[in-house]
């Protein structure tokens, strides 16, 4: 195989159909747009959800609820991600420094991923699931909570 012998597969570059070029082309006169109507005119852009003047579905359905702008995001960290660290104090700053969570996160919960770890961890001021609490305390680690 040489560079000068390379060529695209046949029919891989389909030529666009030229419209408005006579009756024999099959796309002459109206250019495949049919006769009259809004869609046959130039510059036809009908917005999404437009139902021809009928009250659209998204306005017929009642509104409910809202999205709170004050909501604090709680990031989840799997216990399996912490198995590389041993005898470490794991807190919010440590997780940000190691890149396990983003810098704008304020709350973290450590969840179980099914695997059992054997290294000793000290978890400080983080939310922890019940199964993770059991795993860490059985492996000799500690969970220190806010006072």
UniProtKB/Swiss-Prot annotation:
BP GO annotations: translation
Cellular component GO terms, alphabetical: cytosolic large ribosomal subunit
Biased amino acid composition, Basic residues: 11-20, 32-47
Disulfide bond entries: none
InterPro entries: Ribosomal_uL15, Ribosomal_uL15/eL18, Ribosomal_uL15/eL18_sf, Ribosomal_uL15_bac-type
Biased composition (Polar residues): 1-10
Pfam families, sorted: Ribosomal_L27A (PF00828)
Region called Disordered, residue ranges: 1-48
The keyword NAD is annotated on this UniProt entry: no
GO molecular function, one term: rRNA binding
Record's keyword annotation contains Transmembrane: no
Compositional bias ranges of the Gly residues kind: 21-31
Keyword field: Ribonucleoprotein, Ribosomal protein, RNA-binding, rRNA-binding
Family to which the UniProt record says this protein belongs: Belongs to the universal ribosomal protein uL15 family.
Subunit structure: Part of the 50S ribosomal subunit.
Function of the protein: Binds to the 23S rRNA.
HAMAP family cross-referenced by the UniProt entry: Ribosomal_uL15
Protein's recorded name: Large ribosomal subunit protein uL15
Naturally occurring in which organism (per UniProt): Buchnera aphidicola subsp. Baizongia pistaciae (strain Bp)
């Amino acid at each position: 195989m040489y560079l000068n012998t390379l060529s695209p597969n046949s029919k891989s570059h389909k030529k666009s159909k030229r419209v408005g070029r006579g009756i024999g082309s099959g796309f002459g006169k109206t250019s495949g747009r049919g006769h009259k109507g809004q869609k046959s005119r130039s510059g036809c852009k009908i917005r999404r959800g437009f139902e021809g003047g009928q009250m659209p579905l998204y306005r017929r359905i009642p509104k409910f609820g809202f999205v709170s702008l004050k909501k604090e995001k709680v990031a989840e960290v799997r216990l399996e991600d912490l198995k590389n660290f041993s005898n470490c104090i794991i807190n919010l700053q440590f997780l940000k420094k190691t890149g396990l969570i983003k810098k704008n996160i304020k709350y973290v919960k450590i969840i179980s991923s099914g695997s059992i770890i054997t290294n000793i961890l000290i978890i400080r001021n983080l939310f922890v699931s019940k199964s993770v609490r059991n795993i860490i305390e059985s492996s000799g680690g500690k969970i220190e909570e806010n006072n």
